Amino acid sequence: MTVNIRNWQELKKPSNLEIKTGGDGKRKATFVAEPLERGFGLTLGNALRRVLLSSLQGAAITSIKIENVLHEFSSLAGVREDVTDIVLNVKQIALKMEGEGPKRLQLSATGPATVKAGDIMVSGDIKVMNPNHVICHLDEGATLNMELVADTGKGYVPATANRPADAPIGLIPVDSLYSPVRQVAYKVDNARIGQELDYDKLNLTVETDGTVTPEDAVAYAARILQDQLQVFVHFEEAMSDSGLIGMAAPSAASDESDVNQLNRFLLKKVDELELSVRSANCLKNDNIIYIGDLVQKTEAEMLRTPNFGRKSLNEIKEVLSSMGLRLGMDIPGWPPENIEEMAKKLEQELLG
């Protein structure tokens, strides 16, 4: 199979991603990507928006149980809000949870008092992100004892789905909005390259509930799209008989100098590359020793490496490109059994 890599290599891609933050950068930010090929602003903006709103993991309250309350249409003496209003207020509590749920939380208060989300007693792996959110108001002498169940998930789950089959009397299921993203909007403008205006500029504005930063939310969404689309790419298995992606197999009559040069690159250790300390440490922690180890990693695999981000990825891609290499290569017979001996021999040749 012959693959025309120009299909994707010659398309315009954003040179950088500009991030504009307002008063609260941990909750709201605008991402500006340019230049993009005409139509790609709409394509990427719509795809990111849909994934941001529907597919990110978060935490939410799934049910509550209030002392002396049998159902949500009840009322409590000395509590200004009825139970229906309390349920609506509980739905808006923003939680950040480490690990898996469900987790049981307790809330106890005595009036007069304004009961807020910050009054909920939580364990060390749960944090209330909007502690000033009002749940209800208690008059003099009134008491409120409530048990809340929090869980992790994605998207929106209606209250009917949160009611277990063996639900005890008095359990009130709550609609759960797990998504940490509250609003997403995008706008596509014209972008200029030289005298040409036939390019797109994508402006993506993301607002979260504070449990995740806008930067992380967009990164998660992009990663989800990347993983979902990866199944459609089959070039790694069918690029050429040599198994080297983007590199032609040498003919029998061709000179072996190109192959020898390639082997020299593959046998070099990654610590010989002029990489930033962060990138070098990430490779070391992932046990990537030789360039031959590195080039067989895909971009998706590299981004799964702890503390390895897009900036480090671009740095490594640029260094590999200067040697005629790239990520995602398939090197038959790698690593060779005598790799250390071969590497030492290469080093001696270079020194000699």
Swiss-Prot record:
EC assignment: 2.7.7.6
SMART domains hit by this protein: RPOLD
Root EC class: transferase
Keyword Phosphoprotein in annotation: no
Catalytic reactions on record: RNA(n) + a ribonucleoside 5'-triphosphate = RNA(n+1) + diphosphate
GO biological process, one term: DNA-templated transcription
CDD domains: RNAP_alpha_NTD
Its job: DNA-dependent RNA polymerase catalyzes the transcription of DNA into RNA using the four ribonucleoside triphosphates as substrates.
Entry text on domains: The N-terminal domain is essential for RNAP assembly and basal transcription, whereas the C-terminal domain is involved in interaction with transcriptional regulators and with upstream promoter elements.
Protein name: DNA-directed RNA polymerase subunit alpha
Organism: Sphingopyxis alaskensis (strain DSM 13593 / LMG 18877 / RB2256)
